[in-house]
Amino acid sequence: FEIPSFDLTELYKETELSNEDLSGNFLINVWASWCITCRVEHGFLEKLSKNGVRIVGLNYKDDRSDAIDWLKKYRDPYELVIHDFDGSLALDMGVTGAPETFLISNGKVIAHYRGEVNQMIWEDVFIRVIKDSEIIL
């Protein structure tokens, strides 16, 4: 499916964002400061980001200041963070909780995983699809 249309704000600057601001190949990671499993997977996301994987954060049903403080404490692996304060975009994407991760290629979801992404999941779910689709992150 395609990324649903949305009009939300960027977490830090509070500038308006829409699906038109997202292009190319990247991950969308659904996370929240209140999510314990998000903290568990965070180190792996940092590793991916340092290796050049583009990651957009979708901050899910979270208080803006709590989310910013959380990223300051644990570091920010995201190229961009969408503040989905009421969960509307997540709902439109079929999200049932956090964390969830989507692989996006040119506006379309080509892989999706519910739960913690770690090295094993990265290889089994995402790398396989990346190789099969011949996309470059």
Where on the chain are the PLM-derived regions?
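Short active-site neighborhood of thiol/selenol oxidoreductases, capturing the structured segment around
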Residues: 16-39, 45
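Nucleotide phosphate-binding site architecture
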Residues: 9, 36, 46, 110
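Non-globular targeting/processing and membrane-anchoring segments
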Residues: 1, 133-137
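Hydrophobic beta-strand anchors of alpha/beta hydrolase catalytic cores
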Residues: 27-28, 55, 101
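A generic structural signal for alpha->beta connector loops
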Residues: 5, 24, 52, 78-79
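Thiol/disulfide oxidoreductase modules built on the thioredoxin-like
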Residues: 73-77, 84-130
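N-terminal "domain-start" segment that seeds a small globular fold
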Residues: 1-19
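Structural microenvironment flanking redox-active thiols in thiol-disulfide oxidoreductases
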Residues: 39-75, 85-92
